[in-house]
Amino acid sequence: MKTGSILAALVASASAHTIFQKVSVNGADQGQLKGIRAPANNNPVTDVMSSDIICNAVTMKDSNVLTVPAGAKVGHFWGHEIGGAAGPNDADNPIAASHKGPIMVYLAKVDNAATTGTSGLKWFKVAEAGLSNGKWAVDDLIANNGWSYFDMPTCIAPGQYLMRAELIALHNAGSQAGAQFYIGCAQINVTGGGSASPSNTVSFPGAYSASDPGILINIYGGSGKTDNGGKPYQIPGPALFTCPAGGSGGSSPAPATTASTPKPTSASAPKPVSTTASTPKPTNGSGSGTGAAHSTKCGGSKPAATTKASNPQPTNGGNSAVRAAALYGQCGGKGWTGPTSCASGTCKFSNDWYSQCLP
């Protein structure tokens, strides 16, 4: 299927949130949906034991396999809808600012990335970022206009892999199944590299439990601040893979700085109404552990700072106070000044700070 047909099918069904849709390699944009296994819409996965937790509910699969040299700076781009923003004043692109949480990247070695299935694969984590100095990985993604970066480990064996990018939104994670998982997989071929064979692999489903401290968690401190109450945040999943001494591997996105990086392209298909969200306050859940939002490199070196993408940053606009909220959008809560009715679904109370349009 041609990319244009994929775009039309995906954009027509998109409604809210975010979707992984592009890869860059050493600053070179690989193209919209090239090498990407794409879901039918940008809705989250909420069941950690569902098969959708692997690569999402894939309905479109591109045949390209992207070449990634070992040690390359790899970017993964997220947008509210395929192509990025839902419109010129889409304040929720690349994702609603209320959707705080971590970002991770996993790899699984495969024989043929274009045709392999996703069940039974062994995954190892090559990048992670959580909460650091009051800022979440999602905050840096938004500041970077949808791009997040990591360094491909220099020591992993050459060959084909599935690359699983994941963003977890924790704004409503105080109750079980409240965390929202946004996931996508890319098909890559690593060139160069070494012979390291990661031992700390995990399976999906199975790597996460619904009660893990980084998944069932109240991230709100005093006055509704999203600082996890000043406590460290424990990133879900296995320990970050690192190369033996002398090689580099395992990294985390750094704070955004201004530079020139790949620019997402816009889809020509019509866009649905965007979802407006703001900071809710769940009433239960807990967070503990030792969070890790810094880079991990063997040999003591640090990854390059994340750079700011050149695609335009949408501005907050529109008359949200008079329009209905989209499915999964916020429709109430203390201090909420946006829509209080739902274009689809029913406005359901979650806690004093957050009500949401649900099916």
Curated annotation (Swiss-Prot):
GO biological process, one term: cellulose catabolic process
Keywords: Carbohydrate metabolism, Cellulose degradation, Copper, Disulfide bond, Glycoprotein, Metal-binding, Monooxygenase, Oxidoreductase, Polysaccharide degradation, Secreted, Signal
Cofactor note text: Binds 1 copper ion per subunit.
Regions of compositional bias (Polar residues) in chain numbering: 307-319
Disulfide bridge positions per record: C55-C185, C155-C243
Record-level GO cellular component terms: extracellular region
Catalytically driven reaction(s): [(1->4)-beta-D-glucosyl]n+m + reduced acceptor + O2 = 4-dehydro-beta-D-glucosyl-[(1->4)-beta-D-glucosyl]n-1 + [(1->4)-beta-D-glucosyl]m + acceptor + H2O
Pfam families in the record: AA9, CBM_1
Region of interest (Disordered), ranges: 244-320
Free-text activity regulation comment from the record: Activity in inhibited by excessive amounts of H(2)O(2).
Binding positions (Cu(2+)): H17, H99, Y182
Applied use: Lignocellulose is the most abundant polymeric composite on Earth and is a recalcitrant but promising renewable substrate for industrial biotechnology applications. Together with cellobiose dehydrogenases (CDHs) an enzymatic system capable of oxidative cellulose cleavage is formed, which increases the efficiency of cellulases and put LPMOs at focus of biofuel research.
Keyword Ribosomal protein applies: no
Domain of life: Eukaryota
Subcellular localization: Secreted
Residues in the signal sequence: 1-16
Chief place of localization: secreted
Documented EC number(s): 1.14.99.56
Induction: Expression is induced 85-fold during growth on Miscanthus.
Single GO MF descriptor: cellulose binding
Binding residue positions for O2: H171, Q180
Function summary: Lytic polysaccharide monooxygenase (LPMO) that depolymerizes crystalline and amorphous polysaccharides via the oxidation of scissile alpha- or beta-(1-4)-glycosidic bonds, yielding C4 oxidation products. Catalysis by LPMOs requires the reduction of the active-site copper from Cu(II) to Cu(I) by a reducing agent and H(2)O(2) or O(2) as a cosubstrate. Degrades various hemicelluloses, in particular xyloglucan. Active on tamarind xyloglucan and konjac glucomannan. Acts on the glucose backbone of xyloglucan, accepting various substitutions (xylose, galactose) in almost allpositions.
Protein family according to the UniProt entry: Belongs to the polysaccharide monooxygenase AA9 family.
Free-text domain note: Has a modular structure: an endo-beta-1,4-glucanase catalytic module at the N-terminus, a linker rich in serines and threonines, and a C-terminal carbohydrate-binding module (CBM). The CBM domain is essential for binding to and subsequent oxidative degradation of polysaccharide substrate.
Protein name in the entry: AA9 family lytic polysaccharide monooxygenase C
Organism: Neurospora crassa (strain ATCC 24698 / 74-OR23-1A / CBS 708.71 / DSM 1257 / FGSC 987)
Gene name linked to the record: gh61-3
